């Protein structure tokens, strides 16, 4: 049964593929093939994200569209989620997710019909930071684009718009540390939230968020956008964002290992950062742009919010993406 959540192009062939990262975790991807792909060595695009999503959602939509424009394109599930391996489920790692991109480069660059010197990456939402981090070290990635970037290390350790006070950060660290004792004693990983809010007494809200059956009136616009994507038009049974919570201690690694510390080292390879004009996450792309060396470009999409760039074909600038990669994957 095909569980993709977007319109399927009948002229674009998709194959299920398997490959391993250097930790031995088997990753599963959907490989999208342009017409007449076997007749030549093609440029290739690797796509992952959003954070907690699966390849049957936004990354698959992007991969299929890029294949329709002449690229061999791979959308994959990062470790610990979707159809990919990893004995612990519903967790994430900045290191391993970064490695997953390079493992995808290993795989796609070995295909007979791919030019391994013409490989680019698209990172969506929370997989953007890993895409840039991978490109900073893996020079086989010749160009990188990010869509609706979310810096997950910064988000988890500093809060939205860096809102955590030092006292709040200390409380979160203590909660995560004590939760490790509880998990060790129980022999299981308790569910929790990767973004921790505080109550009126300035204590961390640690209970796993319960998603309402219907969107409440007056819901925060960002929450409403996520809800309408993950629970309505693009719901998928394997997506963490739909079926369950993350493991409570998952943020520990993101506190310890900041993403994109090597962003300047992507240069002289180009970076394209795309964000919605009205996105609550826009500042991540703007700050990454300031931190990166040339060549770099920041593209703000008028009227778009964060989730618009997941699946709104009128807002996603595919013409720009195609131009960017054709110019830089020569």
Predicted segment positions?
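N-terminal cap/lid segment of alpha/beta-hydrolase-fold proteins
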Residues: 2-40, 310
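Conserved alpha/beta-hydrolase
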Residues: 65-84
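The serine-hydrolase catalytic nucleophile loop
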Residues: 52-64, 78
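Catalytic active-site module of serine/aspartate enzymes centered on a nucleophile-bearing elbow/loop
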Residues: 304-307, 311-330
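Short beta-strand element of the alpha/beta-hydrolase
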Residues: 40-50
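Alpha/beta-hydrolase-fold enzymes
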Residues: 133-225
């Amino acid at each position: 049964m095909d569980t993709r959540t977007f319109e399927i192009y009948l002229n674009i062939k998709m194959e299920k593929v398997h490959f391993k990262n250097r930790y031995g975790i088997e990753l599963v991807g959907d490989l999208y093939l342009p017409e007449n792909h076997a007749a030549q060595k093609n440029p290739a695009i690797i796509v992952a994200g959003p954070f907690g999503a699966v390849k049957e959602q936004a990354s698959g939509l992007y991969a299929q569209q890029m294949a329709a424009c002449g690229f061999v394109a791979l959308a994959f599930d990062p470790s610990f989620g979707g159809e990919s391996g990893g004995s612990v489920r519903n967790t994430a790692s900045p290191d391993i997710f970064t490695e997953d991109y390079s493992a995808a480069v290993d795989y796609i660059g070995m295909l007979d019909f791919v030019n391994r010197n013409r490989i680019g990456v698209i990172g969506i939402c929370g997989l953007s930071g890993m895409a840039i981090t991978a490109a900073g070290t893996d020079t086989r990635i010749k160009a990188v684009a990010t869509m609706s970037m979310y810096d997950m290390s910064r988000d988890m350790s500093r809060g939205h718009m860096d809102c955590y006070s030092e006292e709040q950060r200390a409380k979160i660290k203590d909660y995560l540390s004590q939760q490790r004792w509880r998990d060790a004693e129980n022999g299981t990983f308790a569910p929790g939230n990767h973004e921790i809010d505080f109550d009126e007494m300035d204590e961390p809200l640690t209970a796993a968020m319960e998603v309402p059956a219907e969107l409440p009136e007056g819901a925060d616009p960002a929450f409403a956008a996520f809800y309408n994507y993950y629970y309505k038009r693009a719901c998928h049974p394997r997506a963490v964002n739909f079926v369950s919570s993350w493991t409570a201690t998952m943020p520990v690694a993101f506190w310890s290992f900041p993403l994109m510390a090597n962003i300047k080292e992507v240069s002289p390879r180009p970076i394209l950062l795309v964000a919605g004009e009205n996105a609550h996450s826009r500042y991540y792309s703007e700050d990454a742009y300031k931190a990166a060396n040339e060549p770099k470009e920041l593209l703000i999409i008028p009227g778009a919010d964060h989730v618009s760039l997941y699946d709104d074909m009128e807002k996603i600038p595919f013409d720009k993406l195609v131009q960017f990669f054709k110019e830089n994957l020569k």
